[in-house]
């Protein structure tokens, strides 16, 4: 009885000891993996972290590797997809990681039982995807193989064993999403290659590239050339693989079917919902560094955060910094590289290689290098300082010469002479520096352009004292045009009238002369009357009439009240500016002329704008004060009709001057037909008729029949108060019209020549002295000088 109990006790003890040994072996193997968590191996295949064998050795369930004993051999399996693992590679800086697995082969007509295999790879809800490094390979005859369940495109190739012509067999048809085929021809990139070393060309073997987009669900379909699925006939196989198949490696489909598997490369990303894991690695986020790698050698690894290409989950892509190697996903996985041991030739033979964390340095005799560096640095410093001082001196000297040259070329000496002759009459204007105006206009930016005039471009500027100004930068002019520029400065210096744009100063030290005017905020009259997009209903009749009075007052002052009568010579709606209260100001005196009291006309080259030029001035070559009156009459016609100075008659499609069209309509008593519709309802008919009659007098073909600007101004003021008392009668001098028919036809003809002219004919002007109304004129005190 005791002997039997003793035997039983020994048996139980032996079993317990055996179980303890087996458990210890398993625990040792498991703890060995867990101690490194990423340094495990299974069947000779390295399993780097975040993959791992056993609980605690992998990051998440998706990265779990099962090490199974298959036919007496340890084989790693990726448990989330139940696929045998061939190798695992960590992602680099510009690529994803890869896991090579054994994937089942799709077959048709190969099984003795008549059953075909068509497995579908489903990687949904995992960090894995089929990468474009793989190819679709088909082996067999008279079939088409294609991919199923993929996004965007349909990919496939055709098998044909009956083709004997080599030129026909080099083309592999691919299929797009519409079912149409296009050919892709393999090029022999290596000279001397044997034909059997080239890729599958469709004769018993074909292959096609996968789309670049990652795929998580993918299948393979085999069908006959007529497009029907088949389960009979010769054996045909198709599979995805990252291996290169050539004619020399071609295997019969039956042998491939017997293998059952092909090697497939799966891409993977470091997908984790727990960002604290990446934080625990103490890696630097790449966006915080200026370069691909960090210059801080104490940083062992660098990570990128981005959105997953296969899901809406953020993933991390990490790598060891320069000077380190290892697994960045393992805690303290990046270890220093000892460059001095790996390659002692990093340093010269005379130097000593010293390794440190993240790098190395070469230590040698520094005395000679320091002396050479100090001497070179001092010499370079002296040389650079000398060159800088010399350059500064030369630039300053050259700028002084340029300013002096520009001042002389831009008429500075001539302007000084003109202003000196008017000493005591003209107050000095401010002389602006080029730097001031460049700062005010942001270096004459295109965004500051207000408009382009006949003599230059106008910019909006802001002075340092906060004043907004208009800066007129003249065009490049020759010496013959300098008189016009100087003329404008001298004339505007004499003018002190609230309806004339005020000149604030000028700059002559630039390549082209620059004038600075007061800024008029609401642009020109032409824009408000004629531009279609303006749709400006502020231009009611009362405002138009007031603008006409303002212009007439300014011209009356220029003709009568200035120290010397001034003829503008370019009166037009684009030269009439409107301030914030829509009060008119006359601008652009580039072609103006000042005449002495005893002169009756001014002889000059004809200039002006088509539609505004006095026909008598054109015929007689004499510019008088009545020529400005004629141009003002055209503006009155614009205010009444809303038409441009040159119009196209709708009935005849004939291009004529507005002045002629207006006179004909008035003669035929059709004022209501040509009146601007925007003022028809709010205007007083008797006022419009009175202004129209006045415009007719101003547009008379003979200058002697026109009123002077003093009379025009007085009449317009009377019309504003009591239009029924207007002294201008609605009558047309028939004799005058008959005498001027030929002349007016000539005027109409020249309209077709363009918007402006300069014709080589001499012409003069007359001068009338009269007292301007006190309401519009400030004392004529000297304003500007040089």
Swiss-Prot record:
Q: Which UniProt keywords apply?
A: ATP-binding, Disulfide bond, Glycoprotein, Kinase, Membrane, Nucleotide-binding, Phosphoprotein, Serine/threonine-protein kinase, Signal, Transferase, Transmembrane, Transmembrane helix
Write the protein's name. Answer: Wall-associated receptor kinase-like 17
**How is the protein disposed in the membrane?**
Single-pass type I membrane protein
- The record's region (Disordered) falls at 766-786
Secreted keyword on record: no
According to its UniProt entry, the protein's GO biological process terms are: cell surface receptor signaling pathway
Per the UniProt topology annotation, the Extracellular ranges are: 31-369
* Amino-acid positions noted as binding ATP in the UniProt annotation, renumbered to this chain: 450-458, 472
Domain Protein kinase span(s) in chain numbering: 444-719
How is this protein annotated for GO cellular component? membrane
Glycosylation-annotated residues: 69, 122, 160, 165, 274
Per the UniProt record, which residue ranges are transmembrane?
370-390
Similarity comment text for this entry: Belongs to the protein kinase superfamily. Ser/Thr protein kinase family.
The chemistry this enzyme catalyses reads: L-seryl-[protein] + ATP = O-phospho-L-seryl-[protein] + ADP + H(+); L-threonyl-[protein] + ATP = O-phospho-L-threonyl-[protein] + ADP + H(+)
* Function description: Serine/threonine-protein kinase that may function as a signaling receptor of extracellular matrix component.
Q: Where is this region: Atypical EGF-like?
A: 301-362
Active-site residue numbers = 570
Q: Which residues carry this modification: Phosphotyrosine?
A: 517, 617
Comp. bias regions, Low complexity: 766-775
Species per Swiss-Prot/TrEMBL record: Arabidopsis thaliana
The signal peptide stretch is 1-30
Organismal lineage = Eukaryota, Viridiplantae, Streptophyta, Embryophyta, Tracheophyta
Query: Which InterPro entries did the record assign?
Result: EGF_Ca-bd_CS (IPR018097), Kinase-like_dom_sf (IPR011009), NOTCH1_EGF-like (IPR049883), Prot_kinase_dom (IPR000719), Ser/Thr_kinase_AS (IPR008271), WAK (IPR013695), WAK-like (IPR045274)
Q: What is known of its domains?
A: The EGF-like region is specific to this family of proteins and seems to consist of the C-terminal of an EGF-like domain fused to the N-terminal of another one.
């Amino acid at each position: 009885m005791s002997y039997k109990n003793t035997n039983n006790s020994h048996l139980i003890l032996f079993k317990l000891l055996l179980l303890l040994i087996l458990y210890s072996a398993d625990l040792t193997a498991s703890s060995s993996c867990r101690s490194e968590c990423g340094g495990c191996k299974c069947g000779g295949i390295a399993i780097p972290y975040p993959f791992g064998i056993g609980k605690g050795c992998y990051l998440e369930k998706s990265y779990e590797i099962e090490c199974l004993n298959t036919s007496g051999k340890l084989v790693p399996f990726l448990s989330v997809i139940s696929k045998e693992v061939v190798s695992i590679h960590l992602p680099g800086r510009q690529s994803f990681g890869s896991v090579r697995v054994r994937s089942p082969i799709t077959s048709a007509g190969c099984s003795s039982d008549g059953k075909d295999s068509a497995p579908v790879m489903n990687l949904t809800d995992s960090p894995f995807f089929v990468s474009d490094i793989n190819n679709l390979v088909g082996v067999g005859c008279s079939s088409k193989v294609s991919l199923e369940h993929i996004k965007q495109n349909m990919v496939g190739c055709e098998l044909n064993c009956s083709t004997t012509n080599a030129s026909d067999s080099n083309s592999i048809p691919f299929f797009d999403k519409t079912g149409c085929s296009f050919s892709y021809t393999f090029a022999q990139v290596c000279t001397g290659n044997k034909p059997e070393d080239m890729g599958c060309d469709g004769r018993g073997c074909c292959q096609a590239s996968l789309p670049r987009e990652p795929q998580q669900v993918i299948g393979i379909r085999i069908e006959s050339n007529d497009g029907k699925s088949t389960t009979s006939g010769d054996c045909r196989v198709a599979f995805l693989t990252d291996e290169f198949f050539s004619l020399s490696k071609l295997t019969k489909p039956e042998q491939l079917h017997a293998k059952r598997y092909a090697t497939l490369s799966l891409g993977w990303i470091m997908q984790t919902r727990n960002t604290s894991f990446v934080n625990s690695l103490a890696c630097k986020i790449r966006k915080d560094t200026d370069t691909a790698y960090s210059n801080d050698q104490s940083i062992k690894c660098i990570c990128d955060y981005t959105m997953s290409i296969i899901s809406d989950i953020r993933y991390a892509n990490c790598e060891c910094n320069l000077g380190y190697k290892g697994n960045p996903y393992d805690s303290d996985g990046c270890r220093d590289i000892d460059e001095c041991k790996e390659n002692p030739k990093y340093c010269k033979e005379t130097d000593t290689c010293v390794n440190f964390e993240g790098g190395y340095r070469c230590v040698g005799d520094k005395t000679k290098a320091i002396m050479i560096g100090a001497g070179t640095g001092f010499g370079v410093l002296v040389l650079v300082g000398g060159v800088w001082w010399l350059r500064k001196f030369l630039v300053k000297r050259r700028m002084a010469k340029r300013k002096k040259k520009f001042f002389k070329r831009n008429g500075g000496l001539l302007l000084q002479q003109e202003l000196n002759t008017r000493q005591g009459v003209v107050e000095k204007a401010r002389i602006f520096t080029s730097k001031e105006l460049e700062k005010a206009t942001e270096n004459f930016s295109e965004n500051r352009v207000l408009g382009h005039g006949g003599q230059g471009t106008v910019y909006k500027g802001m002075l340092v004292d906060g004043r907004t100004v208009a800066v007129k930068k003249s065009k490049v002019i020759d010496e013959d045009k300098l008189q016009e520029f100087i003329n404008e400065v001298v004339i505007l210096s004499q003018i002190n009238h609230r309806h004339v744009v005020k000149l604030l100063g000028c700059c002559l030290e630039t390549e082209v002369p620059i004038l600075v005017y007061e800024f008029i905020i609401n642009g020109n009259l032409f824009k408000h009357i004629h531009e279609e997009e303006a749709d400006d209903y502020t231009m009611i009749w009362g405002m138009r009439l007031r603008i006409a009075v303002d212009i007439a007052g300014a011209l009356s002052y220029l003709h009568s009240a200035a120290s010397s009568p001034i003829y503008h010579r370019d009166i037009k709606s684009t030269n009439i500016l409107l301030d914030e209260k829509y009060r008119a100001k006359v601008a652009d005196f580039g072609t103006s002329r000042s005449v002495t009291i005893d002169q009756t006309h001014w002889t000059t080259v004809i200039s002006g704008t088509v539609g505004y030029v006095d026909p008598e001035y054109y015929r007689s070559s004499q510019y008088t004060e009545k020529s400005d009156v004629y141009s003002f009459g055209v503006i009155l016609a614009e205010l009444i009709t809303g038409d441009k100075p040159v119009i196209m008659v709708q009935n005849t499609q004939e291009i004529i001057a507005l002045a002629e069209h207006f006179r004909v309509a008035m003669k035929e008593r059709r004022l209501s037909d040509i009146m601007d519709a925007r003022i028809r309802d709010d205007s007083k008919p008797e006022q419009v008729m009175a202004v129209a009659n006045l415009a007719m007098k101003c547009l008379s073909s003979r200058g002697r029949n026109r009123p002077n600007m003093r009379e025009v101004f007085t009449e317009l003021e009377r019309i504003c108060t009591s239009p029924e008392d207007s002294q201008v009668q609605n009558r047309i001098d028939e004799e005058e019209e008959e005498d001027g028919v030929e002349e007016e036809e000539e005027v109409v003809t020249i309209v077709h020549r363009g918007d402006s002219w300069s014709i080589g004919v001499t012409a003069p002007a007359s001068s009338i002295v009269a007292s301007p109304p006190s309401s519009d004129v400030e004392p004529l005190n000297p304003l500007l000088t040089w």
